[in-house]
């Protein structure tokens, strides 16, 4: 492993460790997402406690903190395997942030951003898969799970040299969604539309962790 690759992985982890949800909520006076809603510091929980605009802002920053380090590594000539490990490092930072006591989100938006430098066509397919699944089912978590399952096959078709690291990244995302998978199986998972309705009601949100 080159010093450049190692350095970019460290930078990616530190970028991922900057929790957009926690910082945005603190700056704008919204409740701490770790203590309200599902307790998950991610865009979907911010949707619940802060509304669409707040969630969209957090989503954009979560995507960028995965995208920028990987693009930087790509520009520096890092090989495909270590590009993939850089992407994983960014997601690990989001999931286990060193700046926030290693309590982070589930890494879906950051993973999407990290995959973006591989190709915009692939990014479009991943986004379309998530959107289609959510529109058909109403479950944000199911969209993430389906996208993670199918991502290695998309990558194998477009850029096969990245298949192995993306498969590892998909496994990480699926592991973070094991509670959601169990609730989906039991029919206990809440739909994304419910979060919008609960935002209009007093703070009696359910505590089931989503995206």
From Swiss-Prot:
GO biological process: phospholipid biosynthetic process
Main location: membrane
Membrane topology: Multi-pass membrane protein
Record-listed E.C. numbers: 2.3.1.275
Signal sequence residues: none
Transmembrane segments annotated in the record for this chain: 5-25, 58-78, 80-100, 112-132, 138-158
Subcellular location: Cell inner membrane
Domain of life: Bacteria
Keyword RNA-binding: no
SMART domains (alphabetical): G3P_acyltransf (SM01207)
Keywords for the protein's UniProt record, in alphabetical order: Cell inner membrane, Cell membrane, Lipid biosynthesis, Lipid metabolism, Membrane, Phospholipid biosynthesis, Phospholipid metabolism, Transferase, Transmembrane, Transmembrane helix
Catalytic reaction list: an acyl phosphate + sn-glycerol 3-phosphate = a 1-acyl-sn-glycero-3-phosphate + phosphate
Enzyme class: transferase
CC per GO annotation: plasma membrane
GO MF, one annotated term: acyl-phosphate glycerol-3-phosphate acyltransferase activity
Protein family: Belongs to the PlsY family.
Function, in words: Catalyzes the transfer of an acyl group from acyl-phosphate (acyl-PO(4)) to glycerol-3-phosphate (G3P) to form lysophosphatidic acid (LPA). This enzyme utilizes acyl-phosphate as fatty acyl donor, but not acyl-CoA or acyl-ACP.
Subunit details: Probably interacts with PlsX.
Name used for this protein in its record: Glycerol-3-phosphate acyltransferase
Source species: Pectobacterium atrosepticum (strain SCRI 1043 / ATCC BAA-672)
Organism classification: Bacteria, Pseudomonadati, Pseudomonadota, Gammaproteobacteria, Enterobacterales
Name of the coding gene: plsY
């Amino acid at each position: 492993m080159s010093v450049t690759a190692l350095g970019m992985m460290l930078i990616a982890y530190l970028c991922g460790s900057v929790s957009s949800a926690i910082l945005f909520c603190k700056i704008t006076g919204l409740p701490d997402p770790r203590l309200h809603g599902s307790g998950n510091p991610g865009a979907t929980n911010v949707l619940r406690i802060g509304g669409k605009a707040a969630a969209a802002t957090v989503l954009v920053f979560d995507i960028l903190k995965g995208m920028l380090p990987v693009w930087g590594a790509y520009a520096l000539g890092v090989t495909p395997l270590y590009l993939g490990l850089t992407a994983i490092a960014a997601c690990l930072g989001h999931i286990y942030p060193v700046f926030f006591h290693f309590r982070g989100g589930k890494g879906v938006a950051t993973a999407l951003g990290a995959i973006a430098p591989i190709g915009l066509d692939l990014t479009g397919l991943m986004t379309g898969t998530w959107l289609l699944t959510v529109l058909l089912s109403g479950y944000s978590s199911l969209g993430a799970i389906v996208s993670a399952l199918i991502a290695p096959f998309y990558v194998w078709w477009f850029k096969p040299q990245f298949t192995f690291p993306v498969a590892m990244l998909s496994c990480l995302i699926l592991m973070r969604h094991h509670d959601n998978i169990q609730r989906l199986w039991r029919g206990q998972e809440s739909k994304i539309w419910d979060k919008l309705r609960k935002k209009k009601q007093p703070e009696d949100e359910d505590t089931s962790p989503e995206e």
